[in-house]
Amino acid sequence: APSAASQKETVQAAFDEFADRIFKEELSAASTLDLHYIVTDPESCGIETGPPTLGTFRLTNLIQGNAEAKAVKAQLEEFDVSSLAFDQQVLYDTLMETLDAALMAEGLELYEQPLSPTIGVQAQLPILLAEYEFNCKADIENYLALLEQLDQYYGQLLEFEFQKADAGLGLSDEGIDAIASSCEGYLIPPEENFLTESFDARLETFSGGQSAKDNAGLLTD
């Protein structure tokens, strides 16, 4: 029969494989924006990347996400914590706390509040885009592709807000006014918009101070 030490090694190896798989699956499913801020070189970590995407924000996705979290928790619970190494036990506890926190929202998906005056998506997304670093030409191409998806993504947010309103969970008039006010700064002429200015600055930094004409060529090569 396998020794106790051998059994622990087997459990620890299985846990490492589980953690690695969950890490890759989560990041492979992440939006291009999220992935860019987490990992510099996804391929070197074994993370598969598809076409650039802002992701989706739909009620069905929230429900599916909770179902997936429940499935991952069930897999996590199969491990004997006492057989794990100390660092694995720390990761186990962290994962369990994260999953438990996520599952507190199960059945309450329509209470999700993606829009709010100061920390809503409409306030955070432009800032994240403005701080999106250009480390290679693909980053620039992905960034431009993300900009093309903004209308579609905001359309999904609007549809979700209509679903909330139909369920009696819509924003108050004051909340809507505050959110609208928070968007006014993004409605200035494009040539004066901070996203345009930051794009030009990042492009110049990436190209080593080349002229605007040379930068235009960089994008069309």
What residue ranges belong to the model's regions?
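N-terminal maturation segment of proteins
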Residues: 3-221
